[in-house]
Design a protein with these regions (language model features):
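Amphipathic alpha-helical polymerization modules
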Residues: 1-261
Length: 261
């Protein structure tokens, strides 16, 4: 395989990976709390034919290098944590974060998962959980015979119990945030886990300095912009086609050499 073919092949692989990222974004356009991904590229090693500053004669030096690149690759995929639109549901156990922060959930393996999906329900013990049954942290239990559930913007959960005049406070919701959110590891089901890159979680009540407020009876929609994703898809298709043509052009050159030399 010629060097040009190899370089173009890396371009095909990189654009294919970007297309997968775009397809995943579009697939999750209606996923509550989903944050879109972005593929970041980086160039591969360069072959230095002649270095900058290399002496070309007794009195002259090369002012710029003769360096040939060997291609491109996807360096990483990065989550874009912009705010999604808030959708009213009128469900007392639906909560949206307006601003920074993540809900904390106890995963089956004992780790803490972090999510922007605030669609909660109650299990058989009245404890707030995700629809999959993962318990919200800190654990909050709602008494069985309540007539109303209220969640304040700063995370205080209170309920109205029959035959009691005053509402009863049953828990305090807490949010987590990170110094480097892009260092979080997505694991599926709309959950992230902390890594050494993200740093440990910073825990605070909602509406504290640097944290968002809670909105009861609402959910945060995906932040995927369908039009932008379609534009990116067309751009990726064009780049893929150009790299394919580079392979075809290199093949034509090799065929010419084989047939005429």
């Amino acid at each position: 395989m010629s060097n040009a073919m190899h370089v173009a092949k890396t371009g095909l692989n990189a654009q294919n990976s970007r297309m997968q990222v775009i397809a995943n974004n579009l697939a999750n356009v209606n996923t509550t709390g989903f944050k879109r991904d972005r593929a970041n590229f980086e160039s591969l090693l360069y072959q230095i034919k002649r270095a900058s500053g290399e002496q070309t004669s007794v009195d002259t030096n090369l002012t710029s290098a003769f360096a040939v690149g060997t291609g491109v690759r996807v360096n990483n995929t990065q989550k874009v944590y912009t705010q999604g639109s808030l959708i009213n549901t009128d469900n007392a156990l639906d909560m949206a974060i307006d601003g920074a922060g993540f809900f904390q959930v106890l995963l089956p393996d004992g780790r803490i998962g972090f999510t922007r999906n605030g669609a909660f329900t109650r299990n058989q013990d009245g404890v707030l959980t995700t629809p999959s049954g993962y318990v919200l942290q800190p654990e909050i239990a709602i008494p069985e015979s309540v007539t109303q559930i209220n969640v304040s913007s700063d995370g205080i959960v209170s309920v109205q119990i029959p035959e009691q005049v005053d509402a009863q406070e049953v828990g305090q919701l807490q949010l987590a945030d990170f110094q480097n959110r892009t260092g979080l590891q997505p694991i599926g089901e709309n959950f992230y886990i902390e890594t050494t890159a993200s740093g440990p979680p910073v825990l605070e009540n909602p509406f504290a300095a640097g944290f968002g407020k809670l909105i009861q009876g609402a959910l945060e929609s995906s932040n995927v912009n369908v039009i932008q994703e379609l534009v990116d898809m067309i751009e990726t298709q064009r780049a893929y086609e150009v790299n394919s043509k580079a392979i075809s052009g290199s093949d034509d050159m090799l065929r010419f050499v084989n047939q005429n030399l």
